[in-house]
Swiss-Prot record:
Any one Gene Ontology molecular-function term assigned to this protein's record: rRNA binding
Keyword terms of this UniProt record: Ribonucleoprotein, Ribosomal protein, RNA-binding, rRNA-binding
Family according to the record: Belongs to the universal ribosomal protein uS11 family.
Highest taxon of source: Bacteria
Described purpose of this protein according to its UniProt entry: Located on the platform of the 30S subunit, it bridges several disparate RNA helices of the 16S rRNA. Forms part of the Shine-Dalgarno cleft in the 70S ribosome.
Protein name: Small ribosomal subunit protein uS11
Species assigned in the record: Geobacillus kaustophilus (strain HTA426)
RNA-binding in keyword set: yes
Coiled-coil segments: none
Amino acid sequence: MARRTNTRKRRVRKNIDTGIAHIRSTFNNTIVTITDVHGNAIAWASAGSLGFKGSRKSTPFAAQMAAEAAAKASMEHGMKTVEVNVKGPGAGREAAIRALQAAGLEITAIKDVTPIPHNGCRPPKRRRV
C-alpha cells in the first residue's frame, strides 16, 4: 500500500487593495472577517481566537484586539481600503471600527447590516438576575 505524503496547501499571498470588513458583534463575542469584494475570506480574527475567555470576550478591548489582528493579516495581502459592515448589538462595535482605522486601513463606508425581524421568531425570555 503506497503511503500518501502529507502535502499541505500553501497559503497564496493575494494582492487585493480593497475589501469588506464584516464585524459580527454579539453579546458574547466579536468576530472580524475581512473579505474581498466577492466575499472570499482573506483574514479573520475573533476575541476567542486571541485567547480571551468567558466574559472578557464581550469587552470592547477584546473587539479592538480582534480587529487589529484581522487588519494586520489582511494588510499582508496588500489591503488598503475597506468598507465596514457591522452586525449585531454587542459592546465591541465602535471599538472594532476604530481599531481598523488605527491599524492603517482606510474606511470608505460604514453600514449597519443588523438583521431586524418583521415579527419573526419569538425572542429569548428576559433574564432575572
